[in-house]
Amino acid sequence: MAVEYKINEEISLKQFTGLLNRSTLGERRPVDDVECIQGMISNSNLLVTAWVGSNLVGVSRCVTDFHYCCYLSDLAVDTAYQKEGIGKQLQIKTQDKKYFEALAKKRIT
């Protein structure tokens, strides 16, 4: 199984809520509140996702200043893919300085 990690790849409400429901986070997130979920996605400025083919299997959803602080709010991995290191890789990629530098340059003009 090849897992592809993407930075700030656009995901739909359906993909995000589907993943939350397939992980243990669905029980603790407002998955039925469309406006809230849309705000959660839209207002996150760092989203690291894990994909197997076209299937979203993991997400690290963050708010960051791209220089010093990063708050990782949601870390979700589909239960069918847990215990394979995907969550750990999502955290590693979330902390990867090269992504911070590249994204910070896009934001600041």
Which sequence ranges carry the predicted segments?
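Short amphipathic alpha-helix that is part of the acyltransferase structural core
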Residues: 1-31
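Conserved GNAT acetyl-CoA-binding A-motif
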Residues: 91, 97-109
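A short helix-loop-beta-strand connector motif used in the catalytic cores of GNAT acetyltransferases and
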Residues: 38-49
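Conserved acetyl-CoA-binding loop-helix of GNAT-fold acetyltransferases
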Residues: 77, 83-97
